C-alpha cells in the first residue's frame, strides 16, 4: 500500500474534542488512483529511512520519500528528510486535493508499505516546524488498510 499524506476531509466523521476529521470518499476515479499508484511505485525516490529512538538509529518499517516546495524542509525523530522536487503524479494529486479541501499544501511525505509487516506506529504530527493548525491530507492508494487514531491524553482510539 502507498500512503500519501496530504488530508482529505469533507464531513466530520468523528465527534471528539480537538479533532476534526472529514472524509471525502470517491474523490478520485479508479483509473486516476491506478495511474498514480503505478507512477509512484515506479518513479518516486523511495528510501529506507531511519529514526533516532532512545539514542540509536533504527530502520523504519516502510519506505518513504519527501517531496516539497523549494525551501520547505521536514525533520522528525532527529532526521532531516531529503527534499525532492515535485513529481508530476504527486503534483496532480496535490492540485486535486487543494481544490477539494480549499487548503494549500506545500509538501508530501509518501510512505510505501511493502507488505503486511510494514507499518506506522502511533505518532503525533507535532514537530516544531509545523504550525499548530496545519491541515494534513492523507491519500491511500493500493491495498486497503485501517487508519487508526488515538487520543494523546484519554483512553480513546478508533479507526
Q: Model-predicted segments: where are they?
A:
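Non-heme Fe(II) oxygenase metal-center motifs and adjacent flexible, charged/small-residue loops
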Residues: 2-159
Amino acid at each position: 500500500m502507498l500512503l500519501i499524506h496530504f488530508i482529505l476531509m469533507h464531513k466530520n466523521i468523528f465527534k471528539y474534542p480537538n479533532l476534526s476529521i472529514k472524509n471525502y470518499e470517491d474523490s478520485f476515479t479508479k483509473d486516476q488512483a491506478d495511474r498514480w499508484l503505478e507512477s509512484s511505485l515506479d518513479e518516486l525516490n523511495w528510501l529506507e529511512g531511519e529514526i533516532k529512538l532512545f539514542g540509536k538509529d533504527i530502520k523504519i518499517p516502510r519506505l518513504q520519500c519527501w517531496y516539497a516546495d523549494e525551501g520547505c524542509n521536514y525533520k522528525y525523530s532527529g532526521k532531516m528528510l531529503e527534499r525532492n522536487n515535485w513529481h508530476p503524479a504527486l503534483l496532480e494529486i496535490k492540485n486535486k486535493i487543494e481544490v477539494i479541501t480549499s487548503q494549500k499544501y506545500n509538501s508530501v511525505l509518501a510512505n510505501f508499505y511493502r507488505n503486511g509487516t510494514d507499518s506506522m506506529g502511533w505518532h503525533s504530527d507535532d514537530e516544531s516546524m509545523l504550525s499548530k493548525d496545519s491541515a494534513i491530507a492523507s491519500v491511500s492508494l493500493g491495498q486497503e488498510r485501517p487508519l487508526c487514531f488515538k487520543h494523546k491524553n484519554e483512553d480513546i482510539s478508533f479507526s
